[in-house]
Amino acid sequence: KVTAFTKDNIMKMTDGLFHKVFDEVAADYPGIEAEHWIVDIGAAKLADTPEAFDVVVLPNLYGDILSDVAAQIAGSVGLAGSANIGHDVSMFEAIHGSAPRRAGQDLANPSGLFLGAVQMLVHIGQGDVATTVHNAWLKTLEDGVHTYDIHEEGVSTEKVGTAAFAQAVEFLGRGLDDLF
């Protein structure tokens, strides 16, 4: 199911156009359920019952805000990758951006960058490499190697900085690569 969030009841031209194009594109994919929500009630539903949504498409302003909300519901804004897919150009990033407040402190959780890279690798047809990176990231988390934002006493085995977390993923990725 794909859900569009807009505020086309008020923003009739801009969000109205987004809603219209969403409906046109959805008609090209009759096997995928498509629905529309007004962004304010959709945001409340997303915060309360995130599992009710599979894929949510939004204009950039709402998407930038709600992707951070959804990531925080999942545990940290540092965990989610993001993809902006266009006809000719696509962009992949961590949803939290560059974390300038964390610059030079070895604190930022690089998970969003890893997951943005995984999305990019899938997008460019490098599924095997994406799987290796994703599995190495998952194994790092499962091993309890966590950055400050997700560190939890009794669950985490080690609190690490940005560089050490990235090195742990890289190390496991090399080991997983040898297995396949």
Segments from the language model and where they lie:
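Hydrophobic alpha-helical scaffolding
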Residues: 8-12, 32, 36, 55-56, ...
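Conserved acidic
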Residues: 14, 125, 129, 161
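Short alpha-helical patches at coil-to-helix transitions and adjacent helical residues
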Residues: 15, 110-114, 162
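Glycine-rich phosphate/diphosphate-binding loop of Rossmann-like nucleotide-binding domains
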Residues: 1-40
